[in-house]
């Protein structure tokens, strides 16, 4: 069972270094109503946005940074998302003939299997090497709040930083 081995190794690593690892990292999720699910270094930018939003508006926003994609931690992730009203799944790549990116497909499946009712949207970012900013994440959280209030999701996915002609 790969999940068991991953957690055992994470525990050993924590005992050696004091650094905690697992399937994913949760940031300010203890009371979050709106969450971003992401993989990679853009999570640092998202953390800055979360701190700014919480400090200036008091909105309860959080982040889940995926560390292990296979085996996908569907039950654990569904538990972490069980109390949010809306979630944004951030992908850096698209999949052909699909309505989401690779991470989006996995997170949606996990939420569906757990019968979670949160509104969900998939965002594609960083295409063409473009950076994602704190302001971009602030807009994502604003959109999540609107989705949760209106129960209207304008499309299953959207693009951030895409240059239009």
Predicted regions and their residues:
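Conformationally flexible catalytic loops at phosphate/diphosphate-handling active centers
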Residues: 1-25
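Short helix-loop-beta junction
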Residues: 8, 16, 48-63, 112-113
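Solvent-exposed alpha-helices and their adjacent loops that cap or buttress functional pockets
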Residues: 27-31, 79-81, 112-114
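Redox- and metal-dependent alpha/beta enzyme cores, enriched for Fe-S-associated oxidoreductases
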Residues: 31-59, 72-77
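Flexible loop/turn segments at secondary-structure boundaries
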Residues: 43-46, 70-73, 95-97, 128-130
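A structural-propensity feature for long, helix-poor, extended segments
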Residues: 76-98
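Peripheral docking tails and interdomain loops at the edges
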Residues: 91-165
